[in-house]
Design a protein with these regions (language model features):
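Active-site metal-binding loops of divalent metal-dependent hydrolases
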Residues: 58, 88, 187-189, 210-211, ...
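Active-site-proximal loop/helix segment associated with metal-binding centers of metalloenzymes
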Residues: 127-201, 205-214
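Active-site neighborhood of divalent metal-dependent phosphoester bond hydrolases
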Residues: 79-81, 88-114, 253
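Active-site metal-binding motif and surrounding structural segment of the metallo-beta-lactamase
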Residues: 41-86
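Short internal beta-strands
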Residues: 80-88, 207, 246-247
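Binuclear metal-ion centers of metallo-dependent hydrolases, dominated by the metallo-beta-lactamase
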Residues: 107, 111-119, 192-279
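Conserved beta-strand hairpin/beta-sheet module of binuclear metal-dependent hydrolase folds
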Residues: 1-51, 141-145, 151-152, 175-186, ...
Length: 279
């Protein structure tokens, strides 16, 4: 297998998280079981098989591999991918792809779909993604992937199968939708992204940026530029209901040993063993 970029993996329950994220370098994630990826700052070779991607914002470390991904799928005779982008980015992205097509003398077949806060992206009968507003220096979004199931309404649960069938035949809606948050994704954002989107804190797995950790950094400046500090996690530690919390997008000024030391000083139990540092 070709390994052109770093990829780390974590499996929890029935979901696999794969990817890499370092601030100003590149960010890319995918969940193979959901056939879904987040952000296209880089494109590991085997990630091209994932047909649907959602881009949180348009800084280059989150979108630079857009033409590479589309071109590879065309070259390998795969179906055109579906890519969700901030709606203001659709026009510029189309222009960029046209110019890369001219340079490469090839087509760039894909479906680009604009998103805004409040949207619901239907991936399948079982999966839907809700879009929330993040806070960054460019328009940015966060996402929750929900599993959808239909269950018999409470008032009909004691009825026989024949009676339920008759109700259905008479046009009565006997079931209702239940949603279960599987994965939350917060790309670049100040802590307002968490505060405004509490469903992120309920997802089975949360992937969140944690760009800054050093005690001496000024949090107000960090927040102004749309990022988070370790203190922001510590202040919200009682709010996390997630089974796993993946912290990533660390600043390149830090050595991995420094990151682990600062986290262990402030969160010695790693939030009950649920916190994973993507180093």
């Amino acid at each position: 297998m070709v390994q052109n970029l770093p990829v780390k993996r974590l499996t929890h329950d029935n979901l696999t998280i794969e990817g890499y994220s370092r601030a100003a370098v590149q960010t890319y994630w995918r969940i193979p079981e959901l056939k879904l990826g987040f952000d296209l700052g880089g494109q590991p070779w085997d990630f091209m098989g994932t047909p649907t991607w959602i881009v949180s914002h348009t800084h280059l470390d989150h979108i630079a591999a857009l033409p590479v991904y589309i071109s590879r799928r065309r070259m390998m005779k795969m179906d055109p991918p579906r890519i969700y982008l901030p709606e203001d980015a659709i026009g510029p992205a189309q222009q960029i792809l046209r110019q890369f097509g001219r340079l490469d003398r090839s087509r760039m077949p894909c479906e680009l779909i604009g998103i805004r806060a409040g949207d619901e992206l239907v991936l399948s009968r079982e999966l839907v993604v809700t879009v929330g507003a993040a806070t960054h220096t460019v328009p940015a979004f966060c996402f929750v992937v929900w599993q959808r199931r239909r269950k018999l309404k409470l008032e009909f649960q004691n009825l026989s199968g024949d009676k339920i069938r008759d109700l259905r035949l008479n046009g009565t809606e006997v079931s209702e939708e239940h949603r279960y948050p599987l994965v939350g994704y917060l790309g670049d954002s100040s802590p307002e992204g968490l505060d405004r989107n509490p469903d992120l804190l309920r997802a089975k797995i949360l992937i969140t940026e944690l760009t800054f950790l050093a005690p001496g950094h000024r949090k107000e400046k960090i927040h102004k530029h749309g990022h988070m500090h370790l203190d922001d996690l510590v202040e919200r530690v009682d709010q996390f209901q997630n089974e796993k919390i993946i912290a990533a997008h660390f600043s390149t000024r830090y050595h991995p040993r420094q990151i682990e030391q600062w986290v262990d000083e402030r969160l010695p139990d790693r939030i009950g063993g649920r916190l994973e540092l993507w180093l």
